[in-house]
Amino acid sequence: MERPAPLAVLPFSDPAHALSLLRGLSQLRAERKFLDVTLEAAGGRDFPAHRAVLAAASPYFRAMFAGQLRESRAERVRLHGVPPDMLQLLLDFSYTGRVAVSGDNAEPLLRAADLLQFPAVKEACGAFLQQQLDLANCLDMQDFAEAFSCSGLASAAQRFILRHVGELGAEQLERLPLARLLRYLRDDGLCVPKEEAAYQLALRWVRADPPRRAAHWPQLLEAVRLPFVRRFYLLAHVEAEPLVARCPPCLRLLREARDFQAARYDRHDRGPCPRMRPRPSTGLAEILVLVGGCDQDCDELVTVDCYNPQTGQWRYLAEFPDHLGGGYSIVALGNDIYVTGGSDGSRLYDCVWRYNSSVNEWAEVAPMLKAREYHSSSVLDGLLYVVAADSTERYDHTTDSWEALQPMTYPMDNCSTTACRGRLYAIGSLAGKETMVMQCYDPDTDLWSLVDCGQLPPWSFAPKTATLNGLMYFVRDDSAEVDVYNPTRNEWDKIPSMNQVHVGGSLAVLGGKLYVSGGYDNTFELSDVVEAYDPETRAWSVVGRLPEPTFWHGSVSIFRQFMPQTFSGGRGFELDSGSDDMDPGRPRPPRDPDELH
């Protein structure tokens, strides 16, 4: 049998070599052999060492010994500001790779490791101090961490403070620097049971030293999310506060909050605003609500489901109490939902149903002036507009009354509408023709006019329409393409196509994103896909699944107490009485895995 040819090269590595080398160097140090430098710590204590070991262990010593500094040739090097016991620990680490961090040495060792550039030791000290965070030291610990650029410890301290702000003492909170308090108030993670607590935190800080701090009140109030302060508190406490009453910027913030609560503030038509985002700790969430539609057997659905994108959970809301039929329209007005019109195939409906989100109930309100189907509804300046080919009317929820308006100048079949920049826009084909046009309604003049917006995209029929950040988005029903119109610049644009077609799907705006759900996909299969478009990244992503494949459904977004929470206010603040408890709805059971595809 022929022997194999010998190897020309035999790769070899000893995994124990590094540890063996460290042990050897440590032994040489103990035997005081080949030592070529002595470090002198505070107090005059000497530490003999090897330059090569120090330079390899620390960029600080590498720069000292490898450069042209006097220390590169000196036999003795004096280190200022380093306690002897901390230098001992760092030298031991250089030779062993081990250090014992304790409550007695963590902070001074971190300071020394930061000065002498031992990042691993610094990180270990920071990790140890994270475990020691408590109510008594968290504020000082954040100061310490930021002073020494310990990002991990600083972040952990801030998370601890935000989570336990209600348990911190008044004196601790009142001595916060302005920048730190603003950072806490602006953070989504600030754990308060209600937004009133954030307001009280800011107000207490100002009242602790009014002569010096009153000038900062507008800046602080802007960091409070006033739209989510309960209405009775807004009127009884915020509006009555002298610091607010005599400050024009504060009055503007108060007016914004009142407009929001009165459904006169269209958050989708404006740019992103942190004040319009509830804090997770309050239990409020902006949710996607699905109403009606048909399942894959074409059976009508009367269920009302809501989806919380923060948790990915679905819940049942109160079922629609009547036969929905077809051709109805759905819109959100504030935090309530309105279903208008429709038909049962033989007669048209003039009825209007309102879903009251605060009590999780449906109730009929004043009927429309005219029965209709396949119309469109939108909200502009707190009023509900219903637009059909031959008529337009407007509903005022404060008086529960309808008002007839001028009809469109050019009647359009099966149009879609959206409110943008203080105007109402309608898109559709001229009655009896295939020509697509856009018309605009001015509420100040009660007049419709054609919009000279150039060549419209080649739509086969009216696309689904929504407004986001002052732009109008048009989601085609027969393709995955999406068009965008900027009414201010009178310009058209396209965004990346959706991941799939959503024929008969639904469009809504939620959390600064477009949400398209359900409908038939590219393979003509009924889909349960929910995908979202983020304008910041200009990308679509699948964010969830419907409870079941659905088409011809309506979807809107509202703010609601999605998950009930219990919360201890602690001693940092006390809330005034006042209840706004609401039915959170029933959890929707998970679908049978066999139904998923």
From Swiss-Prot:
Question: In the record, what terms sit under GO molecular function?
Answer: cullin family protein binding; ubiquitin-like ligase-substrate adaptor activity
Fetch the SMART domains from UniProt: BACK, BTB, Kelch
Could you tell me which pathway this protein works in? Protein modification; protein ubiquitination
- Answer whether the UniProt record assigns the keyword Cytoplasm to this protein: yes
- Annotated region Disordered: the residues are 570-597
The BTB domain sits at 35-103
Domain named BACK is located at 138-239
Biological process terms from the Gene Ontology for this record are: cell division; chromosome passenger complex localization to spindle midzone; proteasome-mediated ubiquitin-dependent protein catabolic process; protein ubiquitination; regulation of cytokinesis
Output the InterPro entries linked to this UniProt entry: BACK, BTB-kelch_protein, BTB/POZ_dom, BTB/POZ_KLHL21, Kelch-typ_b-propeller, Kelch_1, KLHL21_BACK, SKP1/BTB/POZ_sf
Stretches forming Kelch repeats = 287-335, 336-382, 384-422, 423-470, 472-512, 513-560
User: For bias kind Basic and acidic residues, which ranges apply?
Assistant: 583-597
Q: Keyword Cell division: yes or no?
A: yes
Q: Where in or outside the cell is it found?
A: Cytoplasm, Cytoskeleton, Spindle
Q: Which cysteines are joined by disulfide bonds?
A: none
Keyword entries, A-Z? Cell cycle, Cell division, Cytoplasm, Cytoskeleton, Kelch repeat, Mitosis, Repeat, Ubl conjugation pathway
* CDD domains registered for this protein in UniProt: BACK_KLHL21, BTB_POZ_KLHL21
- One short Pfam family name for this protein? BACK
May I have one GO cellular component term? cytoplasm
Function noted in UniProt: Substrate-specific adapter of a BCR (BTB-CUL3-RBX1) E3 ubiquitin-protein ligase complex required for efficient chromosome alignment and cytokinesis. The BCR(KLHL21) E3 ubiquitin ligase complex regulates localization of the chromosomal passenger complex (CPC) from chromosomes to the spindle midzone in anaphase and mediates the ubiquitination of AURKB. Ubiquitination of AURKB by BCR(KLHL21) E3 ubiquitin ligase complex may not lead to its degradation by the proteasome.
- Assembly and partners? Component of the BCR(KLHL21) E3 ubiquitin ligase complex, at least composed of CUL3, KLHL21 and RBX1.
Instruction: State what protein this is by name.
Output: Kelch-like protein 21
Q: Which gene encodes it?
A: KLHL21
